[in-house]
C-alpha cells in the first residue's frame, strides 16, 4: 500500500499574485489530501490542472477540489472530471471564488493508484 507523495511550493516573497503549487502522486486508492498552510486572501484568477504522462498518468476523468478552512471548494466544482490527456485551465473569474483562509487543502479522487499531476493556483492578493 503506497502513501501519497506531495511537494508544495509557494512564493516566499509577497508578490501581488500569489502562486501555490502541489506536485502530487496519489496513494493506493487514487486519493490525495494535502494542506498548504499560510495566509491566502484574494481572488483566484487562474488554476492549471496538469496530469503526468506515461506510467503515472491518472485515470481519465479524475476529480480535483481545493477546499478552504470552511470546507468550501474554491474551484466551485470546476475541477470535476479532469481529462488526463491535456492540461486543464480554469481562468474564468466567474468560475472560482474569493479566498480568505489560513489553509487550502488539495483533494484528488479517482486518479488511480500511484498516479500524479501538478495543480497550480494563482491568487490576486486583496
Language model: regions and residue ranges:
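Surface-exposed, low-hydrophobicity beta-strand/loop segments enriched in small/polar/acidic residues
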Residues: 2-126
Amino acid at each position: 500500500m503506497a502513501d501519497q507523495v506531495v511537494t508544495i511550493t509557494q512564493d516566499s516573497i509577497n508578490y501581488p499574485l500569489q502562486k501555490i503549487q502541489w506536485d502530487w502522486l496519489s496513494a493506493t486508492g487514487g486519493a490525495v489530501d494535502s494542506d498548504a498552510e499560510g495566509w491566502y486572501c484574494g481572488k483566484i484568477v487562474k488554476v492549471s490542472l496538469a496530469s503526468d504522462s506515461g506510467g503515472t498518468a491518472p485515470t481519465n476523468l479524475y476529480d480535483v477540489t481545493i477546499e478552504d478552512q470552511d470546507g468550501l471548494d474554491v474551484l466551485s466544482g470546476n475541477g470535476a472530471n479532469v481529462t488526463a490527456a491535456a492540461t486543464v485551465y480554469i481562468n474564468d473569474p466567474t468560475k472560482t471564488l474569493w479566498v480568505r483562509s489560513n489553509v487550502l487543502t488539495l483533494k484528488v479522487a479517482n486518479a488511480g493508484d500511484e498516479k500524479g499531476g501538478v495543480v497550480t493556483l494563482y491568487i490576486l492578493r486583496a
